[in-house]
Structures are given as structure tokens and as C-alpha cells.
Amino acid sequence: RLTALTQESFSAVVLDGHEVVIVARSGIDLRVSAASASGVLAYGLHLGARLPAHVTSTGRVLLAALPETEFNRWLKGRTLSRLTAHTITDAKRLRDVIEQVRADDYCLASEEHELGIHALSVPVRNLQGKTVAALNVVAPLGRLPATMMRQTLLPLLIEAANEIRPLI
């Protein structure tokens, strides 16, 4: 439904240790180059793909859902790998970002996993209110600015996450 409405690509993701795992995908053909005339995103992530949690919007949403003590255990002694020049690798900065995600209840991450790409994520909660997954949309910076993502896609992501809630 989200893809039909927006022509964007969406994923559902879960936390597995220090990584996030894509467990569902919906979207356009992501293998086409981002530089192509169609503007379709070259973001070749597939079902089962694993990414470091600290570099993704989904990972940050899922880390923000952890109790503080559990997040501290997750972070303690961890090397935060750099994937781009924009990747946060400092534990204090990551902690600050996670606090902001907790306050906002969503995360927008720009160019931390891949240059020219940003992603917006929201938590997916079960009926007990526990975050069990994150739902995201990924787009090229040039085609879909952050303000547009927040204005147009954030309400759709929140609505979709709320629709999923009774099913999990």
C-alpha cells in the first residue's frame, strides 16, 4: 500500500544483536542506478540483509526502544564502525542521537550508511506497546529532501505502523 501511494521503497526491520535484519520489503526495483533518469534508488538491500544497527534509522529506532540499562550494555565496549564520512562513531554522540529518537519517536538518518541516501524510520509496536520492529523508507537526498520526508512520508509510516500493530 505504501509503495502504491508513494512510489517509494519500504522495509520492516528487526534488531539482532549489533545488527538490524530486513524481514520484509515492499517497493520499486532498487537495482536501477540512483543516477538514472527515473530517479529510482540504487539500494540493493534484500530480505535477510544485515546492517550495523548504529548506522541505520531502523537500528536507531530499535536501539531507542531498549531500556536504558540494556542500551548501555549494547553500547559498552562496542566499536562503532564508519561506513561513510557521516557515520557517527563516537559513543557519546550516538547516545545523544538515541535520546533524540526516544523524544521524537522516529529517526531520520542521512548518508551514514550510504552516501546520497537517507532513511526515515518509525517503531512498530505490539498491542502491549513493546517495539518489535521498525518500518522505514529510503530515498535519495536529491530527489526527496528531509523536510519532504518528514511532511509527507512520516505520517504515512506512523499510520502503517499503527495498522500493523493488531497483527503482531
Where in the sequence are the language-model features?
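Short, basic/aromatic recognition patches
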Residues: 1, 5, 75-121, 159, ...
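Amphipathic alpha-helical effector-binding/dimerization core
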Residues: 1-77
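Juxtadomain coupling helices with adjacent low-complexity linkers
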Residues: 104, 131-168
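Sensor-regulatory modules in signal-transduction proteins
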Residues: 124-127
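Residues at helix C-cap/C′ positions in short coil/turn segments immediately following an alpha-helix
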Residues: 6, 16, 102, 131-133
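Short clusters of small/polar residues that mark proteolytic maturation junctions
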Residues: 25-27, 112, 136
